[in-house]
Curated annotation (Swiss-Prot):
Coiled-coil ranges per UniProt: none
Localization per Swiss-Prot or TrEMBL: Cytoplasm
UniProt protein name: D-alanyl carrier protein
Residues in the signal sequence: none
Superkingdom of origin organism: Bacteria
Gene Ontology terms: cellular component: cytoplasm
Family named by the database record: Belongs to the DltC family.
Pathway given in the UniProt record: Cell wall biogenesis; lipoteichoic acid biosynthesis
Organism encoding this protein: Lactobacillus gasseri (strain ATCC 33323 / DSM 20243 / BCRC 14619 / CIP 102991 / JCM 1131 / KCTC 3163 / NCIMB 11718 / NCTC 13722 / AM63)
O-(pantetheine 4'-phosphoryl)serine modified-residue sites: 35
Highest classification ranks of the organism: Bacteria, Bacillati, Bacillota, Bacilli, Lactobacillales
Encoding gene, per UniProt annotation: dltC
Task performed by this protein: Carrier protein involved in the D-alanylation of lipoteichoic acid (LTA). The loading of thioester-linked D-alanine onto DltC is catalyzed by D-alanine--D-alanyl carrier protein ligase DltA. The DltC-carried D-alanyl group is further transferred to cell membrane phosphatidylglycerol (PG) by forming an ester bond, probably catalyzed by DltD. D-alanylation of LTA plays an important role in modulating the properties of the cell wall in Gram-positive bacteria, influencing the net charge of the cell wall.
Length: 79
């Protein structure tokens, strides 16, 4: 599964929303993810995408849209 689809699947599971046509929507400002869902998202990304993003190094502005999450996951994969 490619990164984009994996991220969209995870976000769909957590928010109940199909965000594929809202790739630049701020998921925090729109109330789609709260702090608990954010931790769950990071755990799911670790499990499904093989990347580790510690909560202590999580900066919301770097992860606030589906496109930014995809870019961050791809960046972490390339480290």
């Amino acid at each position: 599964m490619d990164t984009k689809q994996a991220v969209l699947d995870i976000l769909n599971e957590l928010t109940g929303e199909d965000l594929s046509d809202q790739m630049d929507e701020n998921i925090f400002e729109n109330g789609l993810l709260d702090s608990m869902a954010t931790v769950q998202m990071l755990l799911e990304l670790q499990d499904k995408c093989g990347v580790t993003a510690p909560v202590s190094e999580f900066h919301r502005e770097d992860w606030d849209t589906p496109n930014k999450i995809i870019a961050k996951v791809e960046s972490l994969r390339n480290e």
